[in-house]
Amino acid sequence: MLNCKKENCTGCGVCAYSCPKSAINMVESVEGFLYPKVDRSLCVDCNLCNKVCPSLKKPSIGDFADCYAVQLINKTTLRHCASGGAFYGIAQTVLEQNGAIFGVVDFGTELRYQKATSLKELDELTGSKYFQCAISEKAYGEIIESTQKGLTLVSGTPCMVAAIRNLQRINRKKEGGHAHYQLITSNPINRPDPCFHRTSPAGLVLLGRKKSNADFH
């Protein structure tokens, strides 16, 4: 049974993804945040949800080598990026090595994780989205599969990155410690709830404006 208290839950959804009996569903609160709901009749107490939960099990990330301040040299590309274009620059290098990128795309009233394997697809992932993006079970599966095949860059909030690293650790143990995962992660500043993002276009319409896009640079 999941032991994470509601006040400590980040809504990453990794417990629902990892549950072998599909006993956990992510349910949205009135504030717009996602929380796990456990079906006790399906739960077999395998404890896997507690092992992957980033609030209960913080993954070891080793020592920090150093800290850098970076900015893209290409000024044209920089204008379409945030945070100095650090994510874009790292992503370019990963693509040059035939890797895959996972980031968030803004679809107006919904944010979704999307995979990019080309510069054209990467362009859709640029720019900050100052709202929480719920990562789907499908996206978790695609990310883990990608790390097993080749170099993979994931941009996500610290809780989601921790969840992915916990999944890697569990899978590595299942495979006798021989599994090799090629993962690079990028952690932006945490976001507000997605409910505001969904309702904000309606608020703009009331002011006589229509929301077409939101960029944070």
What are these regions (language model features)?
Residues S41-L42:
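Short, charged amphipathic alpha-helical surface segments
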Residues G11, D45, L153-V154:
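Conserved SAM-binding loop
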Residues L2-N8, V14-E31, Y35-K37, N47-F64:
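Iron-sulfur cluster-binding cysteine motifs and their immediate structural context
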